[in-house]
Amino acid sequence: MPPLLRVEGLKVYFHMPRGVVRAVDEVNIYLNKGEIIGIAGESGSGKSTLALGIMRLIMPPGLIEGGNVYFEDTEVLHLPEKVFNSEYRWKRIAMVFQGSMNGFTPVYKIRDQIKEVLEVHGYTGDPDQRVNELMKMVNLDPSIADRYPHELSGGQKQRAFIAMALALNPQVLIADEPTTALDVITQTHIINLLKQLRKELGISIIFITHDIALMSMIADRMYIMYAGRIVEHADTADIVRKPKHPYTKLLMEAVPDPSKDYIKGIPGFMPDLARLPPGCRFQGRCPFVMDICKREEPGLKRVENSEVACWLYG
């Protein structure tokens, strides 16, 4: 069975006065039906831009410079905007944006804001009944929809925004940092909710985070992203057990350990995406850097059960 969603060679560049920022540079990912994949990396690695590129929500000075996005067998990146907006965006592919729990309009009740989404997209059923269904779907009492955003806790707002993203029964949900600014207990509740939605609705999920430990709780497969490129891809169990790219190893080592009184960070800084060095983009921070790393950029190659972009593996 072909993937439900497939991204091939996606490029998203930002044309700035200081140069062209290659935020997403020839990225390939795929998502199977009923699967949860994770995209992990530090802030600035291109994760959110990749998601916005899939949704075709890149704003100037950003441009989608190349690549393809396939939903089932249909190439959707180059469809007319009117067609993509009416047939795919929110109806087949929906997104919970980073910081979305603060994205509700403060002067309108939650119910009215979800109903507006339904009405704009031509929903023909009873909108109030649909809102009630959606609230129950995310384990909230329907009466919460009759409150203003400021009357909800952070976890309740995040659940309500997930409900709004599910309003039109999408087959794919992109969740961009859905647990940011939530306490650990609430984070776990959101993770469990997404798992529940996958089980009950059969929805496929792209889960984006900088927290690789959190991702290991939910994702079937992981993509590790650095400076606009995928540097490692494997089943979650394989990455957790035996990470191969030096960056992935350092991300794993940076996960806080309660038994230790310090946190190990990753030394150095991500390169300027408008002035990328020749060769590997991780060379300036890599403890295993070699001469070839400074001359040639590695491509993804198969190493055991993983795909890795690193000269350590030939």
Give the positions of each predicted feature.
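Conserved ABC ATPase "signature" region
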Residues: D126-S143, M252
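Short catalytic/signature loops enriched in Gly
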Residues: H233-G314
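Conserved ABC ATPase signature
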Residues: Y148-L152, Q156
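P-loop NTP-binding/switch modules centered on Walker-like glycine-rich loops
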Residues: P178, L182-D261
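ABC ATPase NBD coupling module
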Residues: V76-A94, V120, D238-P243, L273-P277
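Conserved ABC transporter NBD signature motif
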Residues: I64-V76
